[in-house]
């Protein structure tokens, strides 16, 4: 009944000569496409090029709608080991191993400690701040994942061939950021996206030739014990 009454009032207003409101046309958007390439030692192919994250930064940008995503723990690994989520999203860490894990991060201001939990359990964390978050297990020193928390809605990851596309980009000036877990610093370049869209003429090049695995500390800020990861079933 309330819906019917509202309909009648609106009808009277329109027929009474009230000015009709014009719905503005949606702002035009464009597509940015390109590719990345990673320089490797001895010119070897990059097996993990799909772990890269590409995103656009603009002063007028807004974050996408928050999501909930699972990063599964299986065989002492985080799967997937790189995820990209908008600010305000929750990432859950279901444990499918037959032993316990303790997922944590010391990446402020997104640091957290989920404590020890066993097979069949899942715990998660709400990521309220943008930035790169390193994820570890306090039991197994070899476990690592990366959560990129995005303040922008324009982000993607490349395919196995390094190609990428970002859709729905309003025409304008942006900083294009490319990150990869084995590259020390993001590659950043300016791009101007016209109404017709933009295809980058050259691949964005990253250099992983100097990468070396660096051991990290446990959640107490101390080195892992030599027997870390030895399972007690």
PLM features: residue spans?
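Extracytoplasmic copper-binding redox domains, predominantly the cupredoxin/blue-copper superfamily
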Residues: 21-233
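Bacterial N-terminal signal peptides
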Residues: 5-15
């Amino acid at each position: 009944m309330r819906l019917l009454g509202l309909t009648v009032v609106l009808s009277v207003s329109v027929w009474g000569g009230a000015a009709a409101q014009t719905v503005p046309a949606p702002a035009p958007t464009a597509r940015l496409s390109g590719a990345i390439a990673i320089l490797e030692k001895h010119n070897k192919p990059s097996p993990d090029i799909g772990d890269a994250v590409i995103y656009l930064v603009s002063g007028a940008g807004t974050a996408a709608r928050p999501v909930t995503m699972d990063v599964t723990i299986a065989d002492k690994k985080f799967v997937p080991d790189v995820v990209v989520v908008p600010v305000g999203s929750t990432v859950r860490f279901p444990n499918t191993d037959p032993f316990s894990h303790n997922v944590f991060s010391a990446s402020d201001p997104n640091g957290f400690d989920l404590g020890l939990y066993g097979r069949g359990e899942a715990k998660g964390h709400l990521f309220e701040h943008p930035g790169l978050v390193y994820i570890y297990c306090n039991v197994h020193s070899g476990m690592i994942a990366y959560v990129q928390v995005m303040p922008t809605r324009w982000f993607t990851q490349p395919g196995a061939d390094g190609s990428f596309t970002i859709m729905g980009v309003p025409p304008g000036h942006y900083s294009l950021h490319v990150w990869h877990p084995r590259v020390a610093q993001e590659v950043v370049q300016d791009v101007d996206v016209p109404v017709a869209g933009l295809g980058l003429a050259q691949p964005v090049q990253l250099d992983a030739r100097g990468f070396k695995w660096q051991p990290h500390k446990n959640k107490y800020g101390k080195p892992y014990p030599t027997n870390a990861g030895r399972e007690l079933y």
